[in-house]
Structure formats: structure tokens, C-alpha cells
A protein has these predicted regions:
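Helix-turn-helix repeat elements of alpha-solenoid scaffolds
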Residues: 82-95, 120-134, 164-176, 202-215, ...
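Amphipathic alpha-helical segments of tetratricopeptide repeats
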Residues: 94-101, 133-140, 173-181, 213-224, ...
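Conserved small-residue packing positions in alpha-helical repeats and bundles
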Residues: 77-84, 116, 156, 197, ...
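DNA major-groove recognition helix of helix-turn-helix/homeodomain DNA-binding modules
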Residues: 48-65
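Short alpha-helical DNA-recognition segment
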Residues: 18-39
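A short, Lys/Arg-rich alpha-helix, primarily the initiator
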Residues: 1-19
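Alpha-solenoid helical repeat architecture
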Residues: 67-71, 103-110, 143-154, 183-195, ...
Length: 413
């Protein structure tokens, strides 16, 4: 029997098991413990001849197949990963990509794209960014404008989630220029614009953001799909930043009325969340209308549950409690969120911290709360989140007025 080297034996074993849809317990059977099988797959144990014979029998193969060439493994695993979206196939794909240098660049591109999506689904922003950075580099090597634009668009979106606004503006701007210069599809151009409008607004580049939002809306006119809904949502969010709440509400409502939740339930839920946030940002706030949006979103949550969506709704409930003067409820919700691994974008995480400091100010810890808000505003400014920094200063001023003069009852923040 040939000596089978680790960790390649473990990788091959896991690939063969996954291809057959077997659990570790099913493959181990009566002749082996699942713990031992797990250590073999991870490369922690060297396989004995007896173990190899047992596993080959369970898999219905000859022991020599454990030496399977890795040259074709990326294509095989890519087929597995595209036909079955699971953590296990994605982990196999991640392993295959690590040793895939020299293989077909198009296969590597597909693999990196899928791995980025996998990390995004799990809310692992840093992991996603790592794969997308490699995807951007590989796209430049391949040289196809479509692939470059798509990789840069996704990369810009992940940078925005991490709060890295300057490189996000650069990546989204390059993706948009590629789409225009190479006359790429309307879909590619609109996808780049979705990110570009958001990051330009966050960087305080309002004239650019407005111009690009108009271009985006013109591009999706006549559609009623996910891209159309996202375009209206993005343009509406820009109106909110400019304080044009009535115009924002018209755009959000148009998207809610015209978009079928069966098309993309996650987008439908996020539109409801955006509308609820709008009702809380209006002057005066409309907590009852926000409550109705939250309830509609929560009713649909079991059908599209992700940690990020659950956390977005919990954050919204905390802000609603704050607006209604239910400070103990707001604190309890924030504490519960603080005990979980947050899967929220950078801006949403900062807004949670802002709310926590507002609650401190209103409970009498004025100096500590103000110092916390000042630090957050300065950090946002340093990260070029100009819009967010201005919002924090405005909320600090409103909160102080409310604490000192009880201005506007439950309407602050």
C-alpha cells in the first residue's frame, strides 16, 4: 500500500464523502469512531492501512483512489459547490482554492466569487473582503472588463460594510467607469451605481451622489425586479441623508407597492426596515408608523432569517423604544445585542453605540455620554464618513437639549 500523505489524504477523503452526501457517522460505520475520522479529515492523524481499507470499502472505491489527482479537483469541487450551497462544500472549495495556483484562471475566478458570497451570507465581512481582494487582482490578470467591473463592485460593497469609505469610492468609481467605457450591460452599470451612490453620500460628496442616483433611476425605469427595488431604496436613502423625508417616503413606498416579496424576500424585508427608520428620522418622528413596518418585517422574518436581519430589527426596536421614552426597554435590547456577534454594517454598529451614549446622557451621565459621542464623531470623520459624523453631532445636540429642557418629549434622537 502506498504511503498516503497528510493533509492531502484528509482533503481527498472529505471530498469523496461530501460528493456522496454522507455524514461522518455514516462513513465511519461500525468499524471506526467519528472522532478518529474527523482527525483523519483534518490531517491531524496519519491513516493506517486498516483505516484506509475500511474507508475504501465504505465508499465503494479502491484504496488507490485516495491518491486522486488534485489537478482536476478544483473543477470537480466547483461543480459540487454550485449545485449544493452548503458550508461543507464551501469549505472544500476554500481548501481547493488555496492550492489552485496555475489552474484555469476562469475556474479560480468562479471559485473566489462563490467563496465571497459564502462569507457574505454568514456576515463574515473580513473573510469576504479577503476573497474579493484576490478576485479583483485575478480579474485584472484575466483582463475581461465584465469580470473586472463585477469584482470591483462587490469589493466596493464589502469595503463599505467595513466602513472603509475612501477605497470603496475608488473601487465603485472604477467599476462604473469600466461599465460605461466598455458599454457593459445595464445590469453591470446599475450594480456599480448602487454602491457608488451610497459611498459618495457617506463621503459627503452629495453633488456626485445625486448625479449618479439620477443615472441609476433612469437605468432601471420600466423594471420591477430586485435591481429596480434596490435602486429606489438607494435613491430614497440619499433623500433621507439630505433631509428630504417626503421625497424619500415616495420612493420607498413605490418600491414597497411594486416589488413582489417572492422575488427576493430579503430585499422586501430591508425595504420595510428602511421605511421604519425613515418614520423615526422624520421631524416629528412617527413611532406608530414605524411600529407597523417593524411588525410587517418581523412577520416575514422566519422565512428569510439571517443574523444580520434579526440584529437590524432588534436595533430598530431599541431606537423605537428610545423615541417612545421607554429607556429601560431600549437599554435591555442594546445589552442583548451586545452579547451577540454583531453582523451589522459599520454604520449600523456605530448608530447602536450612538444610541447607547444618548441613553447615558438622558440618565444623567451627561459628560460621559457626550465624550462617547465626540469620540464616535471623530472616528467617523477620520474614516471619511463625513455624513455619519455630521449626523452624530446633530444627535448629540438634540439629546442635550432634550436632557436639559425635556424638549419634544419622546421625539429626540
Amino acid at each position: 500500500v502506498h504511503v498516503l500523505e497528510q493533509p492531502s489524504f484528509g482533503r481527498r477523503l472529505r471530498q469523496l464523502r461530501t460528493e456522496r452526501g454522507l455524514s461522518q457517522a455514516a462513513l465511519a460505520g461500525d468499524g471506526m469512531s467519528t472522532g478518529y475520522l474527523s482527525r483523519l479529515e483534518s490531517g491531524a492523524r496519519q491513516p493506517t492501512d486498516r483505516a484506509v481499507a475500511h474507508l475504501a470499502g465504505q465508499l465503494g472505491i479502491s484504496p488507490s483512489e485516495f491518491e486522486g489527482s488534485r489537478a482536476t479537483s478544483l473543477a470537480q469541487i466547483l461543480s459540487l459547490a454550485t449545485s449544493l450551497e452548503s458550508d461543507e462544500t464551501s469549505e472544500l472549495l476554500a481548501e481547493a482554492v488555496r492550492s489552485a495556483y496555475g489552474q484555469d484562471p476562469m475556474l479560480r475566478w468562479q471559485a473566489l466569487w462563490l467563496l465571497g458570497q459564502w462569507k457574505r451570507r454568514h456576515g463574515d465581512s473580513a473573510g469576504e473582503r479577503g476573497y474579493l481582494e484576490r478576485l479583483v487582482t485575478l480579474s485584472e490578470e484575466i483582463g475581461l472588463a465584465e469580470l473586472r467591473a463585477r469584482a470591483l463592485t462587490q469589493f466596493a460593497r464589502s469595503l463599505r460594510v467595513l466602513g472603509e469609505i475612501v477605497p470603496a469610492v475608488e473601487a465603485a468609481g472604477t467599476a462604473h467607469r469600466l461599465a460605461v467605457d466598455h458599454a457593459l450591460s445595464g445590469q453591470d452599470r446599475a450594480a456599480a451605481l448602487l454602491v457608488l451612490v451610497s459611498v459618495e453620500a457617506e463621503a459627503g460628496r452629495m453633488p456626485d451622489a445625486r448625479r449618479h442616483a439620477d443615472e441609476l433611476i433612469a437605468l432601471v425605469r420600466g423594471r420591477s425586479d430586485t435591481l429596480w427595488a434596490e435602486a429606489l431604496w438607494t435613491a430614497g436613502a440619499l433623500k433621507v441623508r439630505q433631509g428630504e423625508f417626503a421625497a424619500a417616503q415616495v420612493l420607498f413606498q413605490e418600491a414597497l407597492d411594486g416589488f413582489d416579496s417572492r422575488e427576493n424576500l430579503t430585499i422586501w424585508l430591508r425595504l420595510r426596515i428602511a421605511m421604519a427608520e425613515l418614520h423615526l428620522q422624520k421631524l416629528p418622528p412617527e413611532p406608530d408608523a414605524a411600529q407597523r413596518c417593524i411588525e410587517a418585517a418581523e412577520a416575514a422574518l422566519p422565512f428569510a432569517r439571517t443574523p444580520a436581519l434579526e440584529q437590524s430589527l432588534a436595533a430598530l426596536r431599541a431606537r423605537l423604544a428610545f423615541h417612545e421614552g421607554r429607556f429601560a426597554d431600549a437599554r435591555a435590547l442594546l445589552e442583548r445585542l451586545g452579547r451577540t456577534e454583531l453582523r451589522l454594517p459599520y454604520q449600523s454598529r456605530i448608530r447602536l453605540e450612538v444610541l447607547s451614549h444618548q441613553l447615558r446622557i438622558l440618565s444623567g451621565e451627561e459628560d460621559e455620554g457626550l465624550a462617547g459621542l465626540q469620540l464616535l464623531a471623530e472616528q467617523a470623520q477620520e474614516n471619511s464618513n463625513i455624513n455619519l459624523a455630521a449626523e452624530i453631532w446633530r444627535l448629540a445636540a438634540e439629546c442635550l437639549m432634550r436632557a436639559r429642557g425635556k424638549v419634544g418629549g419622546g421625539a429626540g434622537g
